Each structure stands twice: as C-alpha cells, then as structure tokens.
A protein has these predicted regions:
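Hydrophobic faces of well-ordered beta-strands that scaffold small-molecule active sites
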Residues: 35-38, 65-67, 86-90, 114, ...
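Conserved, mostly hydrophobic/aromatic
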Residues: 37, 58, 116, 204, ...
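N-terminal capping/small domains of soluble enzymes
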Residues: 1-121, 314-316, 333-350
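Active-site-adjacent beta->alpha loops and helix N-cap segments on the catalytic face
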Residues: 46-51, 67-85, 93-105, 121-132, ...
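Glycine-rich beta-to-alpha transition loops that act as phosphate-gripper elements at the mouths
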Residues: 69-72, 93, 214-220, 264-278
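Alpha/beta catalytic cores of nucleotide-metabolism and tRNA/nucleoside-modifying enzymes
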Residues: 1-7, 191, 248-269, 273-350
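Glycine/Thr-rich beta-alpha phosphate-binding loop at enzyme active sites
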Residues: 20, 41, 125-132, 147-198, ...
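An N-cap/entry alpha-helix motif that binds or orients negatively charged groups
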Residues: 1-29, 137-196, 331-333, 339-350
Length: 350
C-alpha cells in the first residue's frame, strides 16, 4: 500500500469528450470492469453466506468471482449463483484422487477458469495473526465470547446458519479426520501439496481442458516457464500473509511484463483497495486486478449489500481516473503518464 502511494498519474486535458470504456476481454469473455473478486478462504468467518452474496453480485455486474478450495460454501452450492461464470481456485492436493475429484466437481458445476495456487510450499508463521489472537478454528475463550457478544448481528446470523465449515473439503474427511474444527483444519492443511512442480501443473492443465491461471508467481523466470504451460500469470504475495520478506507484486510487475509476450495476460492482486491503485497496476502492465479484502470489509460492515457497495465505489473510482487523464479505453491507459518516487523503485518504465 505504501508503495502504491508513491506512484502518480499525470492528468492530460483538452482531449474532447471522454466516455471511458472499462470492458476487458479475458479468456474470451468480456467483463464489464477490469477487476474481480479474489479467492478467500473461510469466508463464513467474516459473514455467513458470504460466497453466495459475492457470487450473485459478480453475476449482476459481470465480473469474475473466484471460489477458494477452503471456502465455507461448496463448489456445487456456490455454482447455483454463478450462471456458469465462476472461477475455481485450487490449493493443489497431495492426494491426486482428491485433486482429480475437485477438478471434476468444478468442471461439472460449470466453473470456467481454474486458478492454481503455487505459493504455499510451507505454512507461514503469520505473526500478525498470532499477535491479534486470530486462530482457526476460533478459540473458545472469554475474548472470543466478548467479541461475539458486542456483534449481535454477526452472532445471530452465525447461529442461524451454523458454524463455518470447509464446504468443499468436508466430504474427503474420512473417519480419521472427523471431529473438531481444529482436526478438520489440520486435514485441510495436510492435503495441500507443499512443493508444486511443473509436471504436476501440466497434469492439471491436461485434466482441466480450459483456461488455467497460476497464482502466486513473484519472479519473472517462473513467469516465463509457466507461460509455456498455462494461460495466464497471476502475480500475488498471498495478500502479504505468506512471506514477510516478499516484495509487493506491483514492484515486480514491469519486469514480469517485459519478460512475457505482449499479449500474454497478467492478473495481479495484493494490496489493491481502490480503483486508483488498480489503474496504476494496469498502466504498469497488468491486464486485470483481483481484490478480496475490500469486498469482505463491505460484507462485514453491511452484509449482502456491502458487496455491491464496494463494487460501485471501485468502478466509479476507475471511471473517474480515466476521465481525469482523458483516456477512452482501459486498455489504453498510457504508461508515460506515470511518475514514481524513486526512493521506492523503478526509475525507467519505458
């Protein structure tokens, strides 16, 4: 976020009438805006039925919604609200029978795009969560009960809809794994393939037979290798939650853009809270921006209507930026209108 604050757009005026076109072509689909809802796990902890609300909002506004493997709603239940436009994010399972069944379920439920996550070779320490007292599952202590008591609306909705669960992964938990939420969380973690390799990725691509996106790429060498196998690179540092030493994706975006063919699509996330920041990413070479936290902040504050409220704010911000720099098409946001505080990075963008 601090890095994004040091990127500036220089307005250029007297260009005549500007009616910005925000539409983006991605994998043969035309989306109304250049942003979508990133995959987020255990969304039911934020608000019950969050996946349903976001799926319905995404269809209404013609933007992509990516369902996480470890979401609280299942592949099938969420698909009912996606009208065949959903994306499915896969945490690659070590057990290939589970992997193949997940892909089969997603394909049978008409998910169009597969997003394979690559950036979990080991469990991260996540010191910020530990210091904040956050745990999965939540601890049954006075602090938890206190926070539930002062948020009666959330507590009532949670009691009404049931405690959050792993909607997609629950069915793979045999007798050895049934039991407490802590045990189930352990199962979900144990099933993730720690060290993804190119052969595994090729197998996934062959099985899916549709657009495959590789999420978590942070190095141009990896991007070049991946571009020979899959259909899109997804720059991400896991929302800053996986490796504290990792740079922001916006820092490595220009280098990755230069390393790939001009028409090879790049998606980016991590730290994008506003339409202004999304415009900066597009000007630096991204084709599309995914964001998670803003939508869930909206839902946490306002429930179902919060998702639409956040969408409208971001869309209005992007349109306003394009009008201010007199740009008629989102694909034409010109790089030369950028200026950057060089104390951060990237002196030459051309």
């Amino acid at each position: 976020t601090e890095i994004l604050k040091n990127i500036f757009l220089t307005p250029k005026y007297v260009q005549g009438v500007v009616e910005p076109n925000l539409k983006v072509n991605l994998f043969g689909d035309i989306y109304d805006t250049p942003f979508g809802v990133a995959p987020v796990g255990l969304t039911g902890l934020i608000w019950p039925r969050a996946e349903k609300y976001l799926a319905k909002m995404s269809v209404k506004n013609n933007i992509p919604f990516a369902l996480s493997t470890v979401a609280c709603a299942s592949i099938e239940d969420t698909a009912k609200h996606l009208d065949g436009r959903g994306w499915f994010q896969l945490y690659p399972p070590d057990d290939k029978s589970i992997r193949n069944d997940l892909l089969k379920r997603a394909k049978s439920s008409n998910y169009k795009v597969l997003v394979v996550t690559a950036d979990i070779p080991a469990s991260s320490r996540r010191e910020r969560l530990r210091l904040a007292g956050v745990s999965v599952p939540p601890k049954n202590n006075l602090r938890t009960f206190y926070h539930a008591a002062i948020r009666p609306s959330w507590s009532f909705q949670t009691l009404t809809n049931g405690l959050p669960k792993f909607g997609t992964m629950d069915q793979y938990m045999d007798g050895n794994w049934h039991g407490t939420k802590k045990v189930k969380a352990g199962f979900a973690g144990s099933q993730m393939k720690r060290f993804l390799d190119w052969d595994y990725l090729k197998e996934v691509k062959d099985i899916w037979k549709g657009p495959v996106v590789l999420k978590g790429i942070m190095h141009s060498d990896d991007a070049v290798k991946a571009s020979k196998i899959i259909d899109c690179i997804y720059l991400s540092n896991h929302g800053g939650r996986q490796l504290d030493l990792a740079p922001s994706p916006i820092q490595i975006l220009p280098e990755v853009r230069k390393s790939l063919k001009k028409d090879f699509p790049i998606i980016i996330d991590s730290g994008f809270y506003s339409g202004q920041d999304m415009c900066k990413a597009i000007m630096l070479g991204a084709n599309f921006v995914m964001t998670g936290r803003p939508f869930f902040i909206g839902i946490a504050a306002l429930g179902e209507i919060g998702a639409q409220h956040v969408h409208d704010i971001i869309k209005d911000e992007i349109q306003n930026v394009m009008e201010q720099v007199c740009c008629k098409d989102i694909k034409s946001l010109p790089k030369e209108k950028l200026s950057i505080n060089n104390n951060y990075y990237l002196k030459d963008l051309n």
